Amino acid sequence: MRTYAERARAIQPTGVRKMFDLAGEDTISFGLGEPDFQPPPVAIEAFHQAMLDGRNKYTTTAGLPALREAIAKGWDAYAPGLTEDNVCITMSGTNALMNLFLTLLDPGRKVLLPEPYFPLYGPDATLVGGSATYYPCRFEHEFVPQIEDLEALVDEDTVAILYNFPSNPTGGTINAAQRDALLEFARKHDLWIISDEVYDRIIFEGEHVSLS
């Protein structure tokens, strides 16, 4: 009997998923980063009006130009000069990450990923034929990776590094000096930088420091 591809069989359920399966029906879940509020009324109305106007057809490959332009403007504080040509709309953050790994990782090539980490980072790298190497983000360093740990893990097969600030799941953030050190490490080893900043607006002290 034929079986699934090796890359599919290599993907195992995460610890988070196992805990969900063990939970009873009356359990209060703290396991998902899901807001307890609805989208703003202006957004709901805009989606509603778009459906009434028949705007539910195929768009350009990169996404609606007006949406891409708005996103570029929203990032102007972090990366001045962005235009809609620098933005590509995807179905989700995970879909965007898969696209990046498909673009950057040849079979056998490695990406450095943070640990603790969002559960789909590693499986996404595996599914495209790449390999994940995990660098530690320790409590005693406020979950910010240390350059000496990164230096011990990088090798000639490593082509990219993923940074995640604010971090999921630790909540760790970085300051400007730490950002500059992490950028310099990547430049030194000629690594692609993948920056997951999906929680950039959930900051309780200070301001978000972007790697853009």
Regions found by a protein language model. Name each.
Residues 24-27, 129, 157-158, 190:
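Residue-level detector of structured alpha->beta connecting loops
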Residues 1-7:
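Generic N-terminal amphipathic, Lys/Arg-enriched alpha-helix
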Residues 191-192, 203:
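Metal-dependent active-site segment of extracytoplasmic phospho-/sulfohydrolases and closely related
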Residues 55-184, 201-212:
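Conserved core of the PLP fold type I
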Residues 8, 32, 114, 171, ...:
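Glycine- and other small-residue-rich loops at beta-strand/loop junctions that grip anionic moieties
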Residues 7-92, 99:
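N-terminal small-domain helix-loop-helix segment of the aminotransferase-like
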